[in-house]
From Swiss-Prot:
Residues 1-28 form the signal peptide. Its main location: membrane. Residues 29-57, 116-362 are extracellular. Belongs to the TMEM129 family. Keywords: Membrane, Signal, Transmembrane, Transmembrane helix. The chain crosses the membrane at residues 58-78, 95-115. GO terms for molecular function: ubiquitin protein ligase activity. One of its GO terms (cellular component) is endoplasmic reticulum. Pfam families: Tmpp129. It comes from Gallus gallus. This is Transmembrane protein 129.
Length: 362
């Protein structure tokens, strides 16, 4: 039978790992630093920068207490070691206790120093100060980031301990102990590595993860790496102003929907075209409101009264990209081999059509 000390050590090790790197089950139970210190941290949506100033500091303090917690637990799990009486403990345990006390002491000193003068000494505040105008301070930059973070059009991905956020102006990486920030107009982005995982909890298909180096031309801003699923690469590029170079010649695998959209577009371009009457004025696509509608559904695959497809009488209201996305969204995600031959309803009138019925307006 295992001794209580061994059992406690294994249990505490599991607890410490789950506390530092909390899985979804631990997060849902509220056993994280963010949940335990929620009243002090405030709202991330209301004040993103201020929230992470406190979160990084609180996380450092909380994690620094773990060795001391283990020592106190061993006082009860192994009473024969006399850990409750420091002068009776062995030399090894005295050394462990010394470092277990020193770690939170140093962390507390750092936290106190960072919080002085309204968090002016925090590493994040110093990074933001680099981007501040001469007549303003880091708080003006923080206010800009807070405003952009509240917008719904930002790009955000990743687990809470390794999040990547891209706004109109900023590229942000959130880690356990710090926040990396770089201004889009000052950065160079390079794909440096890729890893492929054959099995993932959310999909039965291989998943590719890309590592992208974010380097600022400003020497006072430290470079950092972001990691994301290759399926999100296209969305990231749309949000970035700077191009992404591929120094490692990495073959980037697109998502299944992106691959289908390319095939859908190439097949539609081979269909017959449609000419609108001179009196008809085309309006913006109701899907994206950015591109002029350039698609008309006309039954071409079979005779008018044959087959599953139906004639659509809607005026042109969609662009090719949005129609392709609509077509893909109506498919069985587990059977992509059936996508090209399937029939879907018109997004407006519900008349069924296939790829052969999609005509580009010339």
């Amino acid at each position: 039978m295992e001794s209580p000390a061994v059992t406690f050590t294994l249990a505490y090790l599991v607890f410490a790992v789950c506390f530092v790197f909390p899985p979804d089950e631990v997060r849902s139970a509220g056993l994280t630093v963010q949940s335990l210190l929620a009243a002090w941290l405030g709202s991330e949506d209301a004040a993103f920068v201020q929230y992470h100033l406190r979160r990084s500091t609180g996380t450092l303090l909380a994690h620094s207490l773990l060795p001391l917690g283990y020592y106190f637990g061993m006082c009860f799990a192994a009473p024969e070691k006399h850990l409750c009486f420091f002068y009776l403990a062995s030399k090894e345990w005295k050394t462990f206790f010394f470092f277990a006390v020193l770690l939170p002491a140093v962390s507390s000193t750092m936290a106190y120093y960072w919080s002085r003068k309204g968090w002016n000494n925090h590493p994040l505040a110093r990074t933001l100060a680099v981007y501040a105008l001469p007549q303003s301070g880091w708080r003006a930059v923080a206010s800009s980031i807070n405003t952009e973070f509240r917008r719904i059009d930002k790009f955000a991905t990743g687990a809470p301990g390794a999040r990547v956020i891209v706004t109109d102006t900023w590229v942000i990486k959130v880690t356990t102990y710090c926040l990396h920030v770089a201004q889009q107009q000052d950065i160079h982005l390079t794909v440096t590595d890729s890893r492929q995982h054959e099995l993932t909890p959310d999909s039965n298909m291989p998943v590719q993860f890309l590592t992208i180096r974010v380097a600022s031309v400003n020497p006072y801003v430290k470079a950092f790496d972001i990691r994301l699923n290759s399926a999100e690469y296209g969305e990231l590029r749309e949000k970035l102003r700077a191009p992404i170079s591929n120094a490692a010649n990495v073959v980037i695998h697109q998502s299944l929907s992106d691959l289908f959209l390319e095939t859908f577009t190439s097949l539609v371009e081979m269909n017959q075209t449609y000419s609108v009457p001179s009196t008809q004025e085309l309006e913006p696509c109701i899907g994206c409101m950015q591109t002029i509608a350039n698609i008309k559904l006309i039954k071409n695959c079979q005779e008018p009264n044959e087959g599953e497809c139906q004639q659509c009488y809607c005026r042109p209201m969609w662009c090719l990209t949005c129609m392709g996305k609509w077509f893909a969204s109506r498919q069985d995600q587990q059977h992509p081999e059936t996508w090209l031959s399937s029939h879907v309803p018109c997004p407006t009138c519900r008349a069924k059509f296939c790829i052969l019925d999609v005509c580009i307006i010339r």
